[in-house]
Design a protein with these regions (language model features):
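Active-site HxH/HxHxD metal-binding segment of metal-dependent hydrolases
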Residues: 35, 43-128
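Short, glycine/acidic-enriched loop or turn micro-motifs at the edges of active sites
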Residues: 12, 22, 31-32, 62, ...
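Short, hinge-like loop/turn segments at secondary-structure boundaries
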Residues: 95-102, 184-185, 223-225
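Residue-level marker for buried hydrophobic side chains located in beta-strands
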Residues: 25-27, 56, 79, 164-166, ...
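Conserved beta-strand hairpin/beta-sheet module of binuclear metal-dependent hydrolase folds
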Residues: 1-45, 157-168
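Metallo-beta-lactamase
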Residues: 32-33, 119-121, 135, 141-220
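Short internal loop-to-helix segment that lines adenine-nucleotide cofactor pockets
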Residues: 128-137
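Short hydrophobic/aromatic-enriched beta-strand-loop microsegments
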Residues: 52, 76-82, 166-169, 183, ...
Length: 226
């Protein structure tokens, strides 16, 4: 049966709660200063300690990993992410693993980063390091991991068997037109990730920022937008 997906948005950052036959999967965890709001959303959906099977982080930025350590402790769950972003969450160093000069660092991103006040970040070590193509069926989630570097080295996507792609911060949809995210560390890697996505059966793209959009927007302009 189709898995129920709940979009949770606070401060322009998306988390996704997926209800499966055996419990819940949380994709990304939002900003630390939105923790109380996030917990209320989880509770209202029926997610509680004992039935949150897994937290999956699309990458290691503070606005996506900000509540992971807390939720792991409270809900008795595990955290999964790609190893190539591990230093970001273990050290709380948001420059870790990035180029000295990222390929795309737009003024819109700089303004947004200036105004965001994330709150205290609890560093942590992930329980599971996922790899490209890895199935998440053992957690009751009919989905597979896609390594989608570009925004960061360890960025991943999650593609369900129903064609829902959680793409993290590779793409966004903040101004009504989906496109490449405003911060891209490695543009060549991002282009390769877009090409990879084009070859897959995707129905809906669910980004880390902005509203979900149909897969028809994944075109060459998305990857080559400067």
């Amino acid at each position: 049966m189709p898995q129920e997906i709940r979009l949770i948005n606070f401060g322009g950052v998306n988390c996704y709660l997926v209800k499966t036959d055996t419990g819940y999967i949380l994709i990304d965890t939002g900003l630390p200063n939105k923790r109380t709001d996030l917990e209320k959303e989880l509770e209202s959906a029926g997610c509680q300690p004992g039935n949150l099977k897994l937290i999956v982080l699309t990458h290691g930025d503070y606005d996506h990993a900000g509540n992971a350590a807390y939720l792991r402790e409270k809900y008795g769950t595990r955290i999964a992410m790609h190893y190539d972003d591990s230093g970001r969450v273990e050290r709380g160093d948001w420059n870790w693993g990035l180029k000295a000069k990222p390929d795309r660092f737009s003024i819109i991103f700089r303004i947004g980063a200036f105004f965001i006040r994330p709150g205290h970040f609890d560093t942590f070590k992930a329980d599971i390091y996922v790899r490209d193509g890895q199935s998440l069926s053992e957690y009751g989630f009919d989905a597979a991991v896609l390594h989608l570097p570009g925004h960061t080295r360890g960025s991943i996507g999650i593609l369900t068997t129903d064609g829902d792609l959680f793409c993290g911060d590779l793409l966004d949809n903040l101004f009504g037109k989906p496109g490449l995210q405003f911060f891209i560390d490695d543009l060549a890697a991002a282009n390769a990730s877009i090409e990879k996505m084009k070859s897959l059966k995707i129905h809906t793209v669910r980004p880390g920022h902005g509203k979900p959009f149909p897969d028809g927007f994944i075109d060459e302009k998305s990857a080559k937008k400067q």
